[in-house]
Amino acid sequence: MAGFIQRRKLDLLLAIFSNLQYGSLTVTLPDGSTRVFDGARPGPSADVQFHSMDAVARLISDGKMGFCEAVMDGEIDSSSMSCLIELAVMHDEYLTKQMAANAWRRISLRLFHGLRRNSKFGSARNIAYHYDLGNDFYSSWLDSTMTYSSAVYDRDSDDLSTAQRNKYRNLADLADIQPGDHVLEIGCGWGGFAKYAVEERGARVTGITISKEQHDFARKRLADAGLSDRAEVKLIDYRDLEGRFDKIVSIEMFEAVGQAYWGTYFEAISSLLKDGGRAALQAITIEDDAFDEYVRDPDFIQRYIFPGGMLPSMPRLERPVEDAGLKLMESNGFGLHYARTLAEWRDRFNAAWPGLAKDKFDMRFKRMWELYLSYCEGGFRAGMIDVKQLLFVHNRPTGG
């Protein structure tokens, strides 16, 4: 009976693959045999290897999450995971219908996500889960700017450090940072943008973070550069900060705010921004057509990488922005730049792995991080997600 059920699930999987509409897929089955499926429309060429019948069963029974967990466990592999993810995203609606996770699994994932709400306590816990892996971990594969957000490649020849500084420049231009401006950076990371804004724009910067690891690193970095008199880093939640600032910058911190707190976040920006000020944000967004399913069924990233995370779609931001008395003035998307950034990070992560493996990280962690970077790259290449630089100003007079 068990053998019959396994064969039935394999037949079902192959039937699903036979409806490929885009690109091509080469499938290697547990017995070593290979099947090739070609779509009628252009798309990426990808491959996938199933190392056990259990992997087939997990994909059929648990859908996207089953696939991701099977990859983490070494039961499914691909020579180009980002291409496989891109191909899957291009068939997302069909695959979701054919391989939906079972009801209990979906409920458990929703409960986990719900328990990771970004209250002040929850935010600190969620941020620590990801960023307190250790500064040594991140410094081993990030570039010299220690920047963990999408770069901007002005030229094909730009290396990662140059492209990260391009991003800093674009955000500083968008915010119109001038010499003497007091700039607030919400989610200052390891201090890369703060250092740039002081050295290159003559600004005074207050950076805030709720990661103790990042706080300590950024303070030392700015002190070592002789910038402590013009740049300060505070370990504080954005909801507890007081004061008024000429300009505000926030780089890919919004994804950690959580939908329940979007209004609170924009209200904080509105109250912290001086009259006539400008707030420049860099944020990852998701297509609005995919948003409801994304909210309903938390994904691999929310479960294993960024607990409590939530990508916005642009239409869903309109109400909280308006209610906070703000107005969106510019929106510039550059998703393919993020795809390239992620590919470079993955190469650098793999190059650094021998040293990381000697520390506290095992092969399951390695496969999880490779999947995370490939998962995001594929999403950007397929256009399901984007990264945007956004400019906000007050839409009404504010007191002060």
Whereabouts are the PLM-identified features?
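Conserved class I S-adenosyl-L-methionine
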Residues: 179-187
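A short glycine-rich, Lys/Arg-flanked "PGG" loop and its adjoining helix->strand segment in the class I
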Residues: 263-276
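Conserved beta-strand signature within the Rossmann-like core of class I S-adenosyl-L-methionine
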Residues: 276-284
